[in-house]
Amino acid sequence: MKVPFNWLKDYVDIDMTAEELGDALTLSGSKVEEVVTAGAEIENIVTCQIDKIEQHPDAEKLKICQVNIGSEMIQIVTAADNMKEHDKVPVALHGAILADGSKIKKGKLRGEVSNGMFCSEEELGIADGKEVIGLMILPEDAPIGVCIKEYLGLNKQVLDFEITSNRPDCLSVLGMARETAATTRKTYRMPNTKFEVKCDKNINDEIKVTVNDKLCNRYMARGVKNVKVAPSPTWMQERLLDAGVRPINNIVDITNFVMLELGQPMHAFDRRELKSSNIVVERAKDGDKFVTLDEIERELNSDVLCIKDGEEIVALAGIMGGLNSGVKDDTTEIVFESANFDGTNIRVNSKNLGLRTESSSRFEKDIDPNLAALALDRACALVEELGCGEIMEGTIDVYNNVKEEKTLEVSVSWINKFLGTSLEAEEMKKCLDSLDLKTTINGDTLEILVPTFRIDVDIREDVAEEVARIYGYNNIPATLISTSTEKEAKDKKQLLDEKVIDTMLASGLNQSISYSFVSPKVFDKICVPEDSSLRNVVKIKNPLGEDYSVMRTSTLPSMMESLARNYSRSNEIVRLFEIGKTYIPNSDENELPTERNILTIGIYGQCDYFDLKGIVENLLDSLGLKSASFKRMSENPSYHPGKTAELILGRTSLGVLGEIHPDVNENYGVDVPCYVAELDLDAMYNFSKTEKYYKPLPKYPAITRDIALLVDDAVLVQEIEDAIRKAGGQVVEKVELFDVYKGAQIPEGKKSIAYAIAYRDPSKTLKDKDINKVHDKILRALEYKLGAQLREQ
């Protein structure tokens, strides 16, 4: 869960950096996976207004836009279709850098000049993994010509927490504020929930709620009259964007804001769209159809809990509202829903419907039903603060099985014995009180009142854990234990080294071993520039000779020597690998050099770049690094500028692979193309996930469709595959490249790329109409993102 650092500081006085807080929270049991700075990479992207839109004369799906960027008018050619004249959108100008590192240049699209590119949330790095089709449309009052990072408040730090299933109370900013306050020995502030009722009408006179199923633990509602739907204020939009949620309008934003802040999902119904005064919570009937807010019609069964208006379904309980009752621009009266539903039922239905939302992800973890009242009060307070409506009198509250606080009694001496500590009862009380576990000391006994939101505190061991983590595991003294000496197990590096070796051998490679000392002249042979940092080497005081006088900073010369030696002995097909170290000197000569563990792969004879890439992909698979990607690079002087790639995982470079530069081949006396990969094993091991998980064989068949695409030469295979998978979603099981063609019938500067795409749904047999819908979506995404055209057969 992503928690903006600035939002956290609204509730706790924090006197440390986000990184320091992340470390402290991780030590106290709230694991922070990473601290990210949203939008830090993007450059030269500004807000603009589209003044005029015309059809491209030579391309049906392209439009020519005249754009005001404040300082001048420019022309942008786009394939997007969700904008209109006078809309304000982000535009990446010539030289701009997108969130993924892509650079934007001025160019021509089908003969028309385009001075940049309009941007979506994805290009800005704020889509948060959600699928985005179309441009990001900014509010009408957005200024023109302002840096988008300044306007959206990017460059802000966000803490990404790993929340376990037994801590639903931490699925909110307030929950993490409570943990932060306890960890830093501070107090936290509750958000404002006070408001004034200004409408004399009572919701209980207008709405009746009936709950016909025990799957609904609690259902609360409150009415708002004289609603004014408008964009949210900037501060609220910034909070939502920082947390990865797109602002929509003030009413919807309030429900999303409360969900993120307190952890309680909410929904707002347009009162005029409710067909009667009766709201009924009950199960759907088998075969019922319902169109959700994402404009998709879904077929329901009798397991799905629904909210009905007496005549028809208006929401899927705990999952998503309906298109028929959502808040619109002209909505004037709403009903706020704050409810609590059975977590198991929500989880099953969410999975069966293929609809996992922020709401369902919280309900499925069994959030506290008593949170519903607090959230409803908070939403009404925000309505008053934003001046977007008048709160009606009365509250509807159907709460049949009230959940109450429980009491635990635990011995102080038992906790000390269990933890190996000698803490005073008062110290334990401070730790527990800071977590809202209200504690009373009665002699050697702690009497703890456990709030309903702490479903994980149930036995005395749970209490001891809370004391230990807030007191600080690092503050508990270490003690020696008596034990027998056993053979030391292999560490992670040794086990991974063995896995790498096994993978290389299984790929048909032979292991080679070379000296770590080399000649300074090898850098000339691999065409390293004179000012390169690779020439900054550790010198050996008593070398065996000139050829072994320095420690290597690159393993490429060693591999090229091995390949050249084999070539000189007429070995026509060679497949080698080596695991060795490089030695990078530190600025302080008295310090030891930095050693990096490098895997070098070298092949030649009856092979090409894709053979080398396949070997590397096998390695990535064995190390659990499937999310790594290949990015074209041309600045490495030792490699062929058009046939070289950088291996990247996130923002970390894992190495380089490609064809060796012809000049380097000539320097080593090799007349055939050589392909080499230099991979940083230390970096790969940091990300390695080698655990195996059971996955049952698929019950339903896969269906394969072939597509042949016409794309620019500069478009990478990786970009195409990424676009296919992102647009296709979970039903795309496999994307396999089977043909790359240039030649007759292919325009100059273009290439034909052919893929076989396998579609499979784990929950049902896909029909042609299902596949056609996804297939068409993929083609649209490829055209929009990469300018790809379906090649005519």
Curated annotation (Swiss-Prot):
Mg(2+) binds at D456, D462, E465, E466. Residues 698-791 form the FDX-ACB domain. It catalyses: tRNA(Phe) + L-phenylalanine + ATP = L-phenylalanyl-tRNA(Phe) + AMP + diphosphate + H(+). Its cofactor is Mg(2+). SUPFAM superfamilies: Anticodon-binding domain of PheRS, Class II aaRS and biotin synthetases, Nucleic acid-binding proteins, PheT/TilS domain, Putative DNA-binding domain. CDD domains: PheRS_beta_core, tRNA_bind_bactPheRS. Residues 403-478 form the B5 domain. InterPro entries: aa-tRNA-synth_II/BPL/LPL, B3/B4_tRNA-bd, DNA-bd_dom_put_sf, Fdx_antiC-bd, Fdx_antiC-bd_sf, NA-bd_OB-fold, Phe-tRNA-ligase_IIc_bsu, Phe-tRNA-ligase_IIc_bsu_bact. The keyword Metal-binding applies. Keywords: Aminoacyl-tRNA synthetase, ATP-binding, Cytoplasm, Ligase, Magnesium, Metal-binding, Nucleotide-binding, Protein biosynthesis, RNA-binding, tRNA-binding. Its EC number is 6.1.1.20. The keyword Transmembrane does not apply. GO terms for cellular component: phenylalanine-tRNA ligase complex. Belongs to the phenylalanyl-tRNA synthetase beta subunit family. Type 1 subfamily. Tetramer of two alpha and two beta subunits. This is Phenylalanine--tRNA ligase beta subunit.
